[in-house]
Amino acid sequence: MTDLYIDADACPVKAEAERVAVRHGVRMFLVSNGGIRPPAHPLVESIFVPEGPDVADMWIADRARTGDVVVTSDIPLAAKVVAAGALVVKPNGETLTQANIGNALATRDLMADLRSADPFRQGSGRPFSKADRSRFLDALERAMRKAQEAGRSASGGSEAGS
């Protein structure tokens, strides 16, 4: 069965992800160290983890598997869950796969090196837009369909009626 995991701290698309999860009838886990409003829908569960570096990421990485979808901007977390067989969608609609996760990790490391070399470098990106939100919804919808199919295949097709 497909689960949807949201790396919820500072995630701008929680409401959109919830709509997609409810439409597909899948459980959604909002994983954070607090500060988010509890969900109203019974398919959506808030998971509050202790504060600390990467605690929410570790919670997600320990559970995500083939047939699941993870929404995160965290590239190291994405690498872990892609290795476990999960599909990854970033809030801007970009998907991360076995084919592109190595490049994403290398780019992340390069940008971290550039930022550390120039302490006066300000802001690194453009604001989140309606177009990003639209791309996210489209990418998440496609990922959910693909994950549900992968989940059925991984379980030998035993999820009749899904």
From Swiss-Prot:
Kindly list the cysteine pairs connected by disulfide bridges. Answer: none
Pfam families, per the entry: DUF188
- Please give the NCBIfam families that the UniProt record associates with this protein: PRK00124.1
Homology family: Belongs to the UPF0178 family.
Task: Tell me which PANTHER family the record gives.
Answer: UPF0178 PROTEIN YAII (PTHR35146:SF1)
Q: What is this protein called?
A: UPF0178 protein RSKD131_2223
